[in-house]
């Protein structure tokens, strides 16, 4: 294997000794040679045999591909008539729905920018995002409109028509239904949109600090679309995906509102996750792919006998898990209970447009604990966080990524951008990883989540894995607890299994027998559940706040 500069690259690991870069072993993505193309046009121009684009799992209401593209054109026509121009920011506050992609695709086709927000956010959190991103218009559903009532933004209601009660109290300018019924106009004001122009402004989860706006370009999204096509790329329109992941999140947005449309796939959308609704939808619509996060996969595993007896899941070919690597026990337990279903895994960040690494078949997933191999056209470095030295195979350091899906930067935040992306385009992920001799990435821990005990570094993930191996523990999280003498020590939050009377001393003794003295857990609190974000990652900062509030 050789890269473009003719440096010799090890075919097995993808590592190049001369520049200390790991290169992807996957086929590279092809980007359009025409630079004046937006992601909506790129997706809509692809040929496939798909018939139905989106189905609402609850109501059965659907959009065919012709209906989808007509709706996108109609909404874009109305937005243009309202004065929406290239570079304007549009806020979308909505749960998953078949109309979510219509709004996104219409906005981006004009060169305007979509910014999404979590429907569970408080009015204060949404107001903060509005102040930062400065949208000129908002789309939302009637049930959520009160959350942006104080913003004075003009609002389009995602409904068939506007109820008179809303019009009296808010600045409601239209309904999505009304806009979709508009005849598309070929004469609307058009702006030349380039691949480098901004398409989305998504706010990262902020698990390591204040939430920041991630600026992604049309090129980033087109590269994401091409990566998804390379993974699921049959263009026969025969795949059916269940969408349980939130569309306001980068993976939900890029995969379900964009990428999978290019292959003619049908996407069955759940407005919110409910396991019975999800399983019923798989059975009813003969779904072939189920993207999910590890907690849902664990629920499928724990209730396997009941689920197999009640639901026909014979159409299901693969589950796609993201958020955290799966253990050997989970993978083999799942394969044993669902022998016709493959497990695929993925790793990515909002800053990398949801792309970074993946396993693309069960054989790759059986490299237990891996996040996968580098995505197409992605390059990586493993960097010693203390010295800045780039490391080789099987050495642990911070994972840096570079490729066509890496964000442009953080919105109006040059300081955060320059501390995250260097002058050569390398994104510092904040994840401690190593890449093995076959090119598989293993995430060891979050760099910023390391506990410093008397100068020693302790990885919470290592202790969490040990805690989860205890027969009476169903979930656990480890955080740094401040200590005058040691600086910090490991504290565990533990969820007991039903009927367990596990004590703090028993938990501490259990870990003490398994780790070096500096890694020992020195405080335990028992809780009903561990707080996690929508992708299944532990909200460690919430637990740290809980622990330190009692000091």
UniProtKB/Swiss-Prot annotation:
<dbReference type="GO" id="GO:0016405">
    <property type="term" value="F:CoA-ligase activity"/>
</dbReference>
<feature type="binding site">
    <location>
        <position position="431"/>
    </location>
    <ligand>
        <name>ATP</name>
    </ligand>
</feature>
<dbReference type="InterPro" id="IPR025110">
    <property type="entry name" value="AMP-bd_C"/>
</dbReference>
<dbReference type="Pfam" id="PF13193">
    <property type="entry name" value="AMP-binding_C"/>
</dbReference>
<feature type="binding site">
    <location>
        <position position="537"/>
    </location>
    <ligand>
        <name>ATP</name>
    </ligand>
</feature>
<protein>
    <recommendedName>
        <fullName>Probable CoA ligase CCL5</fullName>
        <ecNumber>6.2.1.-</ecNumber>
    </recommendedName>
</protein>
<feature type="binding site">
    <location>
        <begin position="204"/>
        <end position="212"/>
    </location>
    <ligand>
        <name>ATP</name>
    </ligand>
</feature>
<dbReference type="GO" id="GO:0005777">
    <property type="term" value="C:peroxisome"/>
</dbReference>
<feature type="binding site">
    <location>
        <begin position="443"/>
        <end position="446"/>
    </location>
    <ligand>
        <name>ATP</name>
    </ligand>
</feature>
<dbReference type="InterPro" id="IPR000873">
    <property type="entry name" value="AMP-dep_synth/lig_dom"/>
</dbReference>
<dbReference type="InterPro" id="IPR020845">
    <property type="entry name" value="AMP-binding_CS"/>
</dbReference>
<keyword id="KW-0547">Nucleotide-binding</keyword>
<feature type="binding site">
    <location>
        <begin position="345"/>
        <end position="350"/>
    </location>
    <ligand>
        <name>ATP</name>
    </ligand>
</feature>
<dbReference type="InterPro" id="IPR045851">
    <property type="entry name" value="AMP-bd_C_sf"/>
</dbReference>
<dbReference type="Pfam" id="PF00501">
    <property type="entry name" value="AMP-binding"/>
</dbReference>
<dbReference type="GO" id="GO:0005524">
    <property type="term" value="F:ATP binding"/>
</dbReference>
<feature type="region of interest" description="SBD1">
    <location>
        <begin position="274"/>
        <end position="345"/>
    </location>
</feature>
<keyword id="KW-0436">Ligase</keyword>
<keyword id="KW-0067">ATP-binding</keyword>
<dbReference type="GO" id="GO:0005829">
    <property type="term" value="C:cytosol"/>
</dbReference>
<keyword id="KW-0963">Cytoplasm</keyword>
<dbReference type="InterPro" id="IPR042099">
    <property type="entry name" value="ANL_N_sf"/>
</dbReference>
<feature type="region of interest" description="SBD2">
    <location>
        <begin position="346"/>
        <end position="410"/>
    </location>
</feature>
<comment type="similarity">
    <text>Belongs to the ATP-dependent AMP-binding enzyme family.</text>
</comment>
């Amino acid at each position: 294997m050789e890269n473009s500069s003719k440096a010799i690259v090890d075919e097995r690991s993808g590592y190049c000794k001369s520049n200390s870069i790991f290169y992807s072993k996957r086929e590279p993505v092809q980007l359009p040679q025409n630079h004046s193309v937006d992601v909506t046009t790129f997706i809509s121009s692809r040929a496939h045999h798909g018939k139905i684009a989106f189905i609402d799992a609850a109501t059965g209401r659907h959009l065919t591909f012709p209906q989808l593209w007509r709706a996108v054109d109609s909404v874009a026509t109305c937005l243009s008539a309202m004065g929406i121009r290239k570079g304007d920011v549009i806020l979308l506050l909505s749960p998953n729905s078949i109309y979510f992609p219509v709004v996104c695709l219409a906005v981006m086709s004009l060169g305007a920018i979509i910014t999404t927000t979590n429907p569970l956010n408080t009015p204060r959190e949404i107001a903060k995002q509005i102040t930062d991103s400065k949208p000129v218009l908002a789309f939302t559903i009637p049930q959520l409109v009160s959350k942006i009532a104080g913003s004075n933004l003009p609002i389009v209601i995602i409904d068939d028509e506007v109820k008179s009660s809303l019009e009296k109290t808010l600045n409601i300018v239209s309904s999505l239904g009304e806009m979709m019924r508009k005849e598309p106009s070929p004469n609307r004001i058009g702006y030349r949109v380039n691949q480098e122009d901004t398409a989305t402004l998504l706010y990262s989860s902020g698990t390591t600090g204040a939430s920041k706006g991630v600026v992604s370009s049309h090129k980033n999204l087109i590269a994401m679309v091409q990566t998804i096509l390379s993974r699921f790329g049959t263009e026969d329109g025969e795949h059916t995906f269940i969408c349980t992941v939130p569309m306001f999140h980068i993976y939900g947005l890029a995969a379900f509102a964009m990428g999978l449309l290019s292959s003619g796939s049908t996407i069955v959308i759940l407005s919110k996750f409910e396991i019975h609704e999800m399983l019923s939808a798989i059975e009813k619509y003969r779904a072939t792919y189920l993207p999910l996060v590890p907690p849902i996969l664990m629920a499928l595993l724990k209730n396997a006998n009941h689920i197999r007896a009640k639901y026909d899941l014979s159409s299901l070919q693969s589950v796609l898990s993201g958020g955290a690597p799966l253990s050997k026990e989970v993978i083999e337990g799942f394969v044993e209970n669902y022998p016709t279903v493959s497990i695929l895994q993925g790793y990515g960040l909002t800053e990398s447009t949801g792309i970074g690494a993946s396993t693309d078949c069960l054989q790759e997933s059986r490299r237990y604990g891996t996040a996968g191999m580098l995505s197409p056209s992605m390059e990586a470095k493993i960097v010693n966080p203390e010295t800045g030295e780039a490391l080789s195979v099987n050495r642990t350091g911070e994972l840096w990524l570079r490729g066509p899906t890496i964000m442009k930067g953080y919105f109006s935040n040059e300081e955060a951008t320059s501390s995250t992306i260097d002058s050569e385009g390398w994104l510092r992920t904040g994840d401690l990883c190593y890449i093995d001799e076959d090119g598989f990435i293993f995430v060891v821990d979050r760099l910023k989540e390391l506990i410093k005990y008397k100068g020693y570094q302790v990885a919470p993930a290592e202790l969490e894995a040990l805690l989860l191996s205890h027969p009476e523990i169903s979930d656990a999280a480890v955080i740094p607890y401040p200590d005058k003498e040691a600086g910090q020590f490991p504290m565990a939050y533990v969820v007991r299994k039903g009927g367990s009377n596990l004590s703090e001393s028993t938990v501490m003794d259990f870990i003490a027998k398994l780790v070096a003295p500096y890694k020992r857990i020195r405080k335990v609190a028992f809780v009903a559940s561990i707080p996690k974000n929508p992708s299944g990652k532990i909200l460690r900062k919430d637990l740290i706040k809980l622990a330190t509030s009692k000091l």
